[in-house]
Amino acid sequence: MIEPILLAAARIVTYNQPQLLTNASGFFFERDERLFLVTSRHVFSDAPSKHFPDRIEIELHLDADNMARSTGFSIPLYRDGNALWRQGMDGAGEIDVAVIEIERPALPETTIYCAFTPRHLYGAHDQVEVGTRLLIVGFPLGFHDTLHHMPVARRA
């Protein structure tokens, strides 16, 4: 049995035309029956580093009994010159968070993933105590289990 949090993380590869640019981490989030990929905004666009991909590719698992079965899934970042992703904001302005919607009908029929939902979010008055254990899941610098395409998990 695979821990659900491992299936909520997505390995992201950015491209500009056929050229591979960078690796990144993201996670799936569902709200009102819609599926999103959440990542850092600089993954989609970063002027200071001149990072301007036109698409991303994520790895999707296809078989719960054989996690080595997976496929790449390409997601365009722009249509007719307009961004398909949205920049995160807070009271001070733009933050380094972005989301892009994933069209469920475009996913392979047997896609296996888990997604966070609004019930996983802390409320405005919830507090995390100093010293609370933290689990970090992702694909640092693209590093991952190359057989099963699973993320790295570390406790802090």
Residue spans for each PLM region:
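Serine endopeptidase catalytic core focused on the charge-relay Asp
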Residues: 17, 22-23, 30-32, 52-156
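Histidine-centered active-site/metal-ligand motif
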Residues: 42
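Protease-domain processing segments flanking chymotrypsin-fold serine proteases, especially trypsin-like
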Residues: 1-25, 30
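Cytochrome P450 catalytic-core helices
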Residues: 39
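Compact nucleic-acid interaction/catalytic patches
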Residues: 45-50
